[in-house]
């Protein structure tokens, strides 16, 4: 019998957002909040850290979110739920999330498919000092008040 290792599992939960990816999106969205950052890796003028827990805060304006994720982190779904619920209640809120493209999961179909836009990332963005991109596909989920979901691809080049 073949052995199986889960290449999508990660002990590390605090990967820095790839700068090229963020900069390209920031030109479009002009982010003011980084919703899940550290003091060392925050990408926006305003940000929440583990200490002031973005899940417990009010969100407004244009927000970037690279939530902690991995098979050991059930909190990622909490971030997605909050992004969806808050954008439905606040017309001034846009949340752009970078998450794994786990299209086979219930949470992806129940929550992400209600987003205003889903952009499938072409290629494998590199996080931190890694030589290679993640071994899993990533997606940008854009939550804002909308009646339909738009699907596109996002090219880093």
Task: For the regions a language model picked out, list residue spans one by one.
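Class I S-adenosyl-L-methionine-dependent methyltransferase catalytic core
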Residues: 1-157
